[in-house]
Amino acid sequence: MEESQGYLELDKSRQHDFLYPLIFQEYIYVLAHDHGLNRSILLENLGSDNKFSSLIVKRLITRMYQQNRLIISANDSNQNPFLGHNKDLYSQMISEGFAVIVEIPFPLRLVSSLERKEIVKSHNLRSIHSVFPFLEDKFLHLNYVSDILIPHPIHLEILVQTLRYWVKDASSLHLLRFFLYEYRNWNSLINPKKSIFVFSKRNQRLFLFLYNSHVYEYESVFVFLRNQSSHLRSTSSGALLERIYFYGKIKHLVEAFANDFQASPWLFKDPFVHYVRYQGKSILASKGTPLLMNKWKYYLVNFWQCHFYVWSQPVRIYINQLSNHSFYFLGYLSSVGLNPSVVRNQMLENSFIIDNAIKKFDIIVPIIPLIGSLAKAKFCNVLGHPISKPARADSSDSDIIDRFVRICRNLSHYHSGSSKKKSLYRIKYILRLSCARTLARKHKSPVRAFLKRLGSELLEEFLTEEEQVLSLIVPASSTSRRLYRGRIWYLDIICINDLANHE
């Protein structure tokens, strides 16, 4: 029992009190803005003579040392003596700088945890594709899946309160709270009319950190309750006594939460429950019955509302049967179908025909969302008809081709695990023809005449990139390289980029 209580209590090793001095170091804010991505660093608004400078950081740090300036002006927030007139710029600098500082302890904890578990190549765990082999292995044996839209906190103060378990330094938390409340526009970043947490692009790093910290807190308790009840399956006398001891723990944990809602210990005893999360969506799959899945649904809703002060409703959790439902996750439509096969068995003079159905985990590329992304980025219209890119018509031919080839390569790279490639081939066709239309528009030539003059060079550019990716899996001497249709999961993909943001 003491072990369970110790887990739910604050781990002293998770507290850090060295963060506040780092806030007053100028290089932290320079580091936060300079990631080698060819973007603006610290842009000081000096009229037409804009320039990059760290002097603005120095001025901001000097004001931060003057503690008597840290007073929230309730009457005139736009003319606060601390933030001055450059509120947007200062707030962005503080948010990104603070995010860099508070992220420091987490990589250290992750590395130490992986070293204890002797996990090699831990960077592979960051890959988005590392989730799909797990789904292929586990979901074949499950019956129901719940699509969960994770609720967001109803107030920013909840995010700060969650962080206090990780950061012992009260000064850092007070400073964070000051900027969250002073920069009132940030409150509008959380849109209650939408079903997921909406972040500002300008301050995305800090809000992602606060949100993930909040989600991690309730996931840790949720996973702990789940694990304590399902890892003992033996019926031997020794294990039976230990199992009774664990059921006693579960009973005590349920009593600890009984003040807010009723829960039953048998809810946690299903050994075939799997949980996967990415950003604002998670999936809970089980081999249990619809009744058990509904129990999980209402348990999660009460768990969020009563213990983590986030508002949620049961309608945000959709329960479907895996055999007749496809769930959208990480850019794929996934489902578990039956692959029929017929086996002929000969026994002496008698023969038998056996119909056998084997479960198969299908992962396909959803064509409609991809066409929508291409239409948003002006590669085609909403019907999927390729169009030219006038914004790039002033670039050189090689730059235009390289850009289209890079996008085509990235899409092929990410969707290489698809069971059916037909949809992906259509996307490649749209990009190739859009590239040809862009080049023809630049040279003021009809597309057909331009392609005839260019020959097969344009097509070879796209095929060359595809061959480079495929050569990692199929040897160059293999005659089946062009016919290879197997799934390929890459462990170097750590993010999904919107095509519209990479013009």
Curated annotation (Swiss-Prot):
Usually encoded in the trnK tRNA gene intron. Probably assists in splicing its own and other chloroplast group II introns. Keywords: Chloroplast, mRNA processing, Plastid, RNA-binding, tRNA processing. It is found in: Plastid, Chloroplast. One of its GO terms (cellular component) is chloroplast. One of its GO terms (molecular function) is RNA binding. Belongs to the intron maturase 2 family. MatK subfamily. This is Maturase K. Pfam families: Intron_maturas2 (PF01348), MatK_N (PF01824). Disulfide bonds: none annotated. One of its GO terms (biological process) is mRNA processing. The gene is matK. HAMAP family: MatK. InterPro entries: Domain_X (IPR024937), Maturase_MatK (IPR002866), Maturase_MatK_N (IPR024942).
